[in-house]
Amino acid sequence: MKKYLSSPPLLSPSMPGEELYLYVAVSQAAVSAALVRDKGGSQRLIYFISRAFRGAEENYPRMEKLAFALITAAWKLKPYFQAHTIVVLTDQPLKRAMSSPEAAGRMALWAIELSEFDVQYHS
């Protein structure tokens, strides 16, 4: 245990043009995302973000909270989103929700914002 605690994991730099993976998570009070790269079969953390909900954001439906986590990551990690293909890994049908013709309001605006990046979705 002492050895593990005395050697914290290091953040790994990304390589130009490589595919990066984004894990998004939602709780009752916050959203978070971890941007990782695959290096020889092991994943290395590049960046981690989290953001607490403010005001009415707590009342978003679960799928909107997940989309909010993705757009928050895109805002904070814009240089990575511009330079790399981002593969979003989630257990929810986020791609279908973002590209649905019934998507209105925030979801439609976020989908338009994300369309400028090379984002792929994998469940």
Name these PLM-found stretches:
Residues 63-83, 107-118:
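Metal-dependent nuclease catalytic cores in nucleic-acid-processing enzymes
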Residues 18-27, 70:
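Two-metal-ion RNase H-like nuclease active-site motif
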Residues 27-28, 111:
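Amphipathic alpha-helical blocks
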Residues 18-21, 86-94:
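A glycine-rich phosphate-binding loop feature that marks nucleotide/adenosyl-phosphate handling sites
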Residues 41-68, 72, 90-96, 104:
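A short, polar/acidic, helix/strand-boundary loop motif
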Residues 12-18:
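Short coil/turn segments at secondary-structure boundaries
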Residues 28-37:
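Acidic, metal-ligating active-site segments
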Residues 1-12, 117-118, 123:
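Amphipathic alpha-helical
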